[in-house]
Amino acid sequence: MKLGSAIPWALLLSTXTLVSTAQNKGSDDCGGFLKNYSGWISYYKALTTNCVWTIEMKPGHKIILQILPLNLWTIEMKLEVRDQRAGPDNFLKVCGGTTFVYQSSSNVATVKYSRESHHPASSFNVYFYGIPQGAKA
């Protein structure tokens, strides 16, 4: 194989690796600031009772969140999703049940997990990705 034909393949393979690793980034820490185009939030640590994650996409994009079925109790544990543009009184509170899909109206959304300290932590998974404002999920 000539060196000239090997370079495009090397570039292609390195690009595919970069894309696949970027899409698998997420957070299992208690809170944080996520600016990836896609990722996940997962929490299962027992000590912290309140965690807040802020997800930010590029301007002109909105965020799609897929919240997998939860095993949280309504009063003692909850997961809240807030949309930056919607205002402080407009949020989704999820306590359990089926899979939820939430579409933000702006490029910033906040996910908050809270529980009473006398209850053990319950794991959950939230997947997110960004799409252009005019696109449908």
From Swiss-Prot:
Signal peptide: 1-21
Subcellular location: Secreted
GO cellular component: extracellular region
InterPro entries named among the record's database cross-references: CUB_dom (IPR000859), Sperma_CUB_dom_sf (IPR035914), Spermadhesin (IPR000124)
Coiled-coil spans in chain: none
GO biological process terms, semicolon-separated: single fertilization
Entry superkingdom: Eukaryota
Residue pairs linked by disulfide bridges in the UniProt entry: C30-C51
Swiss-Prot/TrEMBL keywords: Disulfide bond, Fertilization, Glycoprotein, Heparin-binding, Secreted, Signal
CDD domains tied to this protein: CUB
Pfam families reported in the protein's UniProt record: CUB
Tissue: Seminal plasma or sperm.
Glycosylation sites: N36
Chief subcellular location: secreted
Alphabetical list of SMART domains matching this protein: CUB
Ranges for domain CUB: 30-131
One GO molecular-function entry: heparin binding
Purpose: Inhibitor of sperm motility.
Similarity-based family: Belongs to the spermadhesin family.
Name used for this protein in its record: Seminal plasma sperm motility inhibitor
The organism of origin for this protein: Sus scrofa (Pig)
